[in-house]
């Protein structure tokens, strides 16, 4: 691509990574990049693994400036490491486990003074002002989404498929107080369908909008024939809950502004709607699926589909928001 300039490359001594796409490793001054540093990359982290946290200063890009360590991280989202608002320059926040190894916590760290504040809960996301954070039950998440969970606490009491008390918490970063705003029990009663029965329910990707007045999140459940996901939006107190996409196939999304969301997913159609119902899945969709695959061809790969007989490399799409037209670039 034209007009690209190499800023820095990570050293070869460790494996460096950041985390999920919804958080930026860059501070607001665009001169420091946050990173995790570990000594392996060939397995899922376990409870005995530690990860260094720090940053690269772009004026001295060859040096990793270590700030802290954590044993609470995964490959997908790291330790939820991020710059803390409102300035997104002076302080960072990340997840860890307490000194007894019994409870997940989060820490706020001043990168200049090393002053540390310990909060009695882990965080999933933080609003841009650095006022409120949002969280889920990470102990329970371990049993259903291992790649997005933490290995530090293996609580078998949280392995039940359904826990009506699980849900989303709002966390006040100043006072350290927390309050449940949405429960799994409420989510199941929101347009309840038969596939929810005896399914493993969990919540992921809780994201506040730009002003911190609303959150968007995914409610997922694993049932006999697959996983159904729906995108839901609510006020930060849990009020005015609305299902935005109920196609069953919705994953990566982000707030474009305070009232618009851009997302990868499927559109709602009769076929996707049938997947929510256990009997239709068992007696209609599952028997017909092999025929459907044969008709559309085994060599068809689009978007985030499963690989059949072709392997597709990475490429990027440039999408015009107004026209919907797209073009690819940066292909392998």
Locate each region found by the language model.
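Multi-bladed beta-propeller domains
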Residues: 1-19, 54-77, 111-123, 176-201, ...
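Blade-loop segments of beta-propeller domains
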Residues: 15-23, 39-40, 46-97, 104
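Residue-level detector of Asp-centered blade-edge/turn motifs that repeat once per structural unit
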Residues: 28-29, 85-88, 128-129, 210-211, ...
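Hydrophobic beta-strand positions that form the internal "hydrophobic ladder"
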Residues: 30-34, 92-93, 133, 215, ...
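Short, conserved, GDST-rich strand-edge loop motifs in beta-rich repeat architectures
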Residues: 36-50, 94-98, 136-165, 218-228, ...
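Beta-propeller blade signature
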Residues: 50-60, 105-112, 162-175, 229-238, ...
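Asp-box/WD-like beta-propeller blade repeats and closely related beta-sheet repeat scaffolds
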Residues: 70-86, 91-167, 180-197
């Amino acid at each position: 691509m034209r007009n690209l300039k190499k800023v820095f490359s990570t050293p070869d001594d460790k494996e460096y990574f950041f985390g999920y796409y919804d958080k930026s490793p860059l501070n607001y001054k665009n001169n420091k990049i946050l990173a995790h540093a570990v000594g392996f990359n060939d397995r899922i982290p376990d409870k005995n693994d530690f990860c260094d946290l720090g940053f690269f200063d772009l004026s001295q890009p060859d040096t990793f400036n270590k700030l802290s360590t954590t044993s609470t991280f995964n490959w997908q989202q790291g330790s939820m490491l991020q710059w803390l608002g409102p300035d997104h320059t002076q302080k960072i926040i990340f997840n860890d486990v307490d000194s007894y190894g019994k409870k997940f916590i989060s820490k706020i760290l001043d990168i200049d003074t090393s002053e540390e504040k310990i909060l009695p809960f882990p965080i999933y996301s933080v609003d841009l002002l650095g006022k409120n954070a949002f969280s889920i039950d990470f102990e329970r998440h371990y049993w259903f989404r291992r790649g997005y969970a933490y290995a530090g606490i293996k609580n078998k009491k949280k392995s039940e498929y359904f826990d009506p008390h699980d849900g989303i918490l709002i966390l006040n970063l100043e006072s350290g107080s927390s309050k449940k705003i949405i429960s799994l029990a409420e989510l199941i009663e929101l347009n309840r369908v038969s596939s929810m029965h005896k399914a493993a329910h969990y919540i992921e990707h809780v994201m506040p909008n730009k002003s911190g007045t609303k959150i968007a999140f995914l409610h997922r459940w694993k049932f006999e024939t697959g996983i159904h996901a729906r995108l839901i939006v609510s006020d930060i107190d849990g009020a005015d809950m609305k299902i935005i996409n109920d196609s069953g196939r919705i994953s990566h999304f982000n707030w474009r502004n305070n009232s618009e969301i851009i997302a990868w997913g499927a559109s709602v159609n009769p076929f996707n709607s049938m997947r929510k119902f256990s009997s239709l899945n068992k007696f209609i969709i599952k028997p017909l699926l092999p025929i459907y695959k044969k008709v559309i061809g085994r060599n068809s790969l689009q978007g985030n589909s499963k690989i059949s007989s072709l392997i597709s490399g990475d490429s990027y799409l440039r999408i015009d928001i107004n026209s919907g037209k797209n073009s690819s670039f940066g292909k392998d």
